[in-house]
Amino acid sequence: MDNKIVYVVSDSVGETADLVVRAAMGQFPFAPDIRRVPYVEDTGTLKEVISIAKSNRALICFTLVKPDMRQYLLTEAAKEGVEAYDIIGPLIDQIAEITRQVPRYEPGIVRKLDEEYFKKIEAIEFAVKYDDGRDARGILKADIVLIGVSRTSKTPLSQYLAHNKRLKVANVPLVPEVDPPEELYQVSKEKCFGLKINPEKLNHIRKERLKSLGLSDGATYANINRIKEEIDHFEKVINKINCQVIDVSNKAIEETANIIVNAVQNQRMF
């Protein structure tokens, strides 16, 4: 038996229709000859496909979300004696009836969702790779650069922005004994956000951190004078960069993230 030609017609890439057709044709002992026709936007293209399908005695399977395009293809194919199968239309109509919601009728939704998912994964991987100043090269690649002393929520904030806002975030810890990476002075100051914290608040946070690790809270790490020294160093660096500073002393991560996102959006508007 000759291979049956199937024209897969779509207003997007056509992956959904292609997969469904291959799954169905897999139930038969002959290889399908699938010819994809993607990104169909006008009835002229549909008319041409119908004509070719008629001459090849082919089947048309399609995923067109716009009702007028779907109806045109079904009507014109029937006039020409061409079999046309609507893969997605009846399901959209059924869901609309059950939910009493109006469909968006927007082509390529699945692909757009996939792209958003991969952007999120890419942002999360970026945050891990360039966490805690591990690789200064990330500073110049980042959408956002967080700067602060230890225990100012740089890491969880980086992950939150990556996971929820799909932003690539690098974070840089500051200590007096180590010069900040040169990249910190090369990146646009609009991308940088200094995370400021009250010395007493930081003192409490660090003591609790040491206790959770089974260490003495009298270590230099939690010493108030040491903390003030670190904050002084932080302020000198931030003043040199001249970037926005956010006081995170009494802010939840979500609140700080919203401030950053709003600042970024405002910058893009001007």
From Swiss-Prot:
EC annotation from Swiss-Prot or TrEMBL: 2.7.11.32, 2.7.4.27
UniProt-recorded Gene Ontology molecular function terms: ADP binding; ATP binding; phosphotransferase activity, phosphate group as acceptor; protein serine/threonine kinase activity
Chemical reaction(s) catalysed: N(tele)-phospho-L-histidyl/L-threonyl-[pyruvate, phosphate dikinase] + ADP = N(tele)-phospho-L-histidyl/O-phospho-L-threonyl-[pyruvate, phosphate dikinase] + AMP + H(+); N(tele)-phospho-L-histidyl/O-phospho-L-threonyl-[pyruvate, phosphate dikinase] + phosphate + H(+) = N(tele)-phospho-L-histidyl/L-threonyl-[pyruvate, phosphate dikinase] + diphosphate
InterPro entries: Kinase-pyrophosphorylase, PPDK_reg
Keywords: Kinase, Nucleotide-binding, Serine/threonine-protein kinase, Transferase
Domain of life: Bacteria
Transmembrane intervals: none
Binding site for ADP: G148, V149, S150, R151, T152, S153, K154, T155
Family: Belongs to the pyruvate, phosphate/water dikinase regulatory protein family. PDRP subfamily.
Function of the molecule: Bifunctional serine/threonine kinase and phosphorylase involved in the regulation of the pyruvate, phosphate dikinase (PPDK) by catalyzing its phosphorylation/dephosphorylation.
HAMAP family assigned to the protein according to its UniProt record, in alphabetical order: PDRP
Protein name: Putative pyruvate, phosphate dikinase regulatory protein
